[in-house]
Structure formats: structure tokens, C-alpha cells
Amino acid sequence: MKLTIDRSAFLRPLGHVQSVVERRNTIPILANVLLKARNGRVQLTATDMDMDILESVSCNILQEGSLTVPAHILYDIVRKLPEGAEVSLEADGENSRVLVLAGRSKFTLPFLPADEFPAMSDEELPCRFSLGSDDLKALIDKTRFAISNEETRYYLNGIFFHASKTSDVPMLRAVATDGHRLARVEIPLPEGAKEMPNIIIPRKAIAEVRKLIDDWSDDIDVSLSETKICFSIGDIILSTKLIDGTFPDYERVIPSGNDKNMRVS
């Protein structure tokens, strides 16, 4: 594999994928990012075995190929290079090394074979719909502060999403609670989401999705099953396992028939 790419164009997807990689890994290849260079693009993939992220970006490919390199180290190298630098990556198969060049800077990184990288699951995700980026931001921002950090109650370690009705109007609700406070927010149910199962998206996945959509203004394609959800955000695909548990009946703790209202702005 041999390619050249603009430093800024490479840094953005590297920042996204390295964020998924755990700092400590008992399986060495999980500390790596998979790079696949083909058809004028380099595809970056990372996983922690619960969550996968894939992103591709245009580059100048001199020799197609694929390999895996330490994600955090490569990100730190590219991040510290000067703006406007051209980055060159060249694999040395005999020594299992990757040469990273940029101007006078030269780095050598070890690599592991691409075929040792965990294969992404190909699960059928039958429920599909689109969400506006502002809607998804609101669903996350208005609930995630209430996500529990208590690992023993794992079913509270995420945001509960489900289809419901308010005054007979179909709605998509997001709910989070830590047992002391509860946040619930809803938006009109997107077309195609009527048959969606009740799901709990883990805290880490919520944080990663929120970072990815921070500067995104277009719609986000969502596909899901009872065990997995996938977000397509432009050239980025993030998928995660869902929390296998039952969210408590939160509506029982919300008082009804209140005759007093307060608006805070």
C-alpha cells in the first residue's frame, strides 16, 4: 500500500475513528485502525467489538492495499504536522512497518495484517428512517445528562428510544434516568419508524454520534434491529450494539393531572 493525502483531509476521519478505539486493549489489533486504499479513496475502520465506525476520504493512491496501524499514534502524528502538509504512507511488507512521511518529518510504525482485523457484522436491520440533524441533536442534548453511570443498573446506561403517542399524534421519544432525575423529549415520529422496536443506545455510542453530527446539517439515515443500530452520516457509518435490557416504566413516575406549569428560558 502506498498513498499520499492532504493532512487536513486525513486528520478529520482519523479523529473520528481513533475516538472509538479504547486506550487499553488486551487484543492488540483492537488498538489499530484498518486502512484500505482502493479506487481513489482510503477507507478507515475502527472497532471496540461493541461499536464500529467506517469513514472514507479521497486520496492519491500509488499502490492499492490494506493494513492496520496503531490508531492513536497515527492520529497524534498527523495532528502535530503543520497545516497544508502532504502526508505519505508507504508499507514495508518485509519488515511489517509503515513509513509516514511529511516534509522533513519521518515516522515508522508497526502494522498488523488487515485479515486479522475483526470482520464487521452483517446483521439485517429491517427498520429504516431518516432524522434531521437538529432533531437528533435535541433528542440527545436534552436527555443525556440524566444517563446513569451506575454499572450495576446497566439498562440505565444509555438513552431509551421508542415510538409513542401524545394526544394521538405519533411521536419518537428519547428518555434517560439515573434513578434520581428523569429527562424525556419527543419529536414527531419519522416516516418508517412506526414499527421500530424499543431500544437503549449505550452512553459511549451516544457520545460518539453527538460528536459526529456537531457540524452536520443534513439528514441522518438510521437503520436498526432489536440488537443493533446504524447511523449513516455522509461518508461516515457508525454502528453499535444496543443494551440488552428492559428500560423501566418511566411514565409511572411522571405525575399526571398537574394544574401548575412553569416555563424556564
Predicted segments, located by residue:
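Structural preference for solvent-exposed beta-strand-turn elements
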Residues: 1-265
